[in-house]
Every structure is written in C-alpha cells, then in structure tokens.
Amino acid sequence: MAGAKEIRSKIASVQNTQKITKAMEMVAASKMRKSQDRMASSRPYADTMRKVIGHLANGNLEYKHPYLEERDVKRVGYLVVSTDRGLCGGLNINLFKKLLADMKVWSDKGVQSDIAMIGSKGVSFFNSVGGNIVAQVTGMGDNPSLSELIGPVKVMLQAYDEGRLDRLYVVSNKFINTMSQVPTLTQLLPLPASEDQELKQKAWDYLYEPDPKPLLDTLLRRYVESQVYQGVVENLASEQAARMVAMKAATDNGGSLIKELQLVYNKARQASITQELTEIVGGASAV
C-alpha cells in the first residue's frame, strides 16, 4: 500500500485538476449561452431562406438555374463543420462517423468525395485517416463571421459551377438542447424540393424584376452561405454544451476519486498507527 505522504500528494493533485475542470465547466456554460443567443438570432433568417428556396425548387420557373437541376453523380462535396478545440466529449468523432458512413455509401457506387473543412480537429482527423481536403479554415474563435467562411464555400461552389462536383452537402452538429447534439448531413446542391405538402400541391409562378438570372444567382449563393453559417453557429453552441457536460463529468469523477483516495489514506494511517503501537508494546515487553 502506498504511504500516507504519497496518497496526500495524489489527493492534492486531483483537487487541483478538479478546480481546473470546474472553471472550464463554468466558462463553457457562459460561452454556450452566448452561442445560443447567436444561434437563435441567425436561425429565423436561415429558416426563411430555406422556405424561399423550397418554393423555388417546387416552382415553375422561366429560368432554370443550374443549382436546381439534378445531375448524374460522379463526385460529391462536403462542407464539414468541426471544432478547433477538444475536451468536448464525442462531438467530433460522432460527426466524423456519420460523414465517413455517407462517403462509404457513395464510394461503393464509384463516386469520389471532396471535403472543405472548417475547424482544426477535422483537418487533423482526415489528414490521419485519409481524405481529399480541398479547402480549410481554422481558428475562427467563439464569434465566427460569414466573411471567414467565404473561402471554403467559394471553392466548393466554383467546383460545382465548373461541373467538378455534382452534389454538395453541409455536415455539422445540430443543437437540440444542453444534453443532446445531433450530427446532421444536409443536401445543399442541387436544391432539394420542400417537403411541405401544401407546397407540393400548388404550382408556383414567379415574376422577376428586372431579370431572373442575376436575382437567382445572388439568392441561391446567399442561401448556401446562410445554411453553412447556421451550421457553424449551431456547431459552436453544440461544442460549448458538450464541453460543459464533459467538464462536469470530469469534476464529478474527480470528487469520487478523492473519496476513494481519502479512504485509502485513512487505512494507511490506521495501519501506520497500529504498527507504531505494536512496536511500543513490543518494546515495553522487552524491557
């Protein structure tokens, strides 16, 4: 059994670690609330854009934009939103598993994949397991802006425009609540038709001023950008929630470990005192 001094040192070490994890839990909780506010403020715009695009996809348009037309799929692209930091449980690995599963489905059909990665954890993971990363952005911090995302989005849209990609997805974690974050894979291009039954039963006609082409060119790009940005802010809220839960679990585990070490320490003290008493009694008997 370890000596009392060694056990006291272990207890002190665990207590110091526990203070760190508790502080990280509180910081993550504060950042999560801010991320939730940012997510809530951007969600109405993203949802409205999704509805407008759903109308367009179901509509009888005089100008058929390339983003609305289905193609034979020979190559797919993924805009993947991961985190820059760890200590957030299985948030990233669950997302990567979902992505790899979808990539395998396409690979079995002879379709290749390109990845535009957001977040350093995703870059590290796919550099190690293998993946064709064509664009990346890292270090966006806790307050990401749309301008920081333009690079990867532009690369993928250009590839789609030039026919080098036939389908484009955004992959990110959807924030449900503090305890639940769900990895999601959403098709961006070609634009999926709305699942709203009311829209499917109606024929939509549109009048454009002055001309449909420049309007749709701008609107559809804004749609893609808005969905990627929404994925980033939701993933950030998911990251902070997962980190808060992970740090709380670490703090609680530290408390349990301290109790176990305290019990071992008490037994060691008891054994030490018993041994000293035995030596004293033995010495007295010898006299």
Swiss-Prot record:
CDD domains: F1-ATPase_gamma. It is found in: Cell inner membrane. Its main location: membrane. GO terms for biological process: proton motive force-driven plasma membrane ATP synthesis. InterPro entries: ATP_synth_F1_ATPase_gsu (IPR035968), ATP_synth_F1_gsu (IPR000131), ATP_synth_F1_gsu_CS (IPR023632). SUPFAM superfamilies: ATP synthase (F1-ATPase), gamma subunit. The keyword Thylakoid does not apply. Produces ATP from ADP in the presence of a proton gradient across the membrane. The gamma chain is believed to be important in regulating ATPase activity and the flow of protons through the CF(0) complex. NCBIfam families: ATPsyn_F1gamma (TIGR01146), PRK05621.1-1 (NF004144). F-type ATPases have 2 components, CF(1) - the catalytic core - and CF(0) - the membrane proton channel. CF(1) has five subunits: alpha(3), beta(3), gamma(1), delta(1), epsilon(1). CF(0) has three main subunits: a, b and c. Belongs to the ATPase gamma chain family. This is ATP synthase gamma chain.
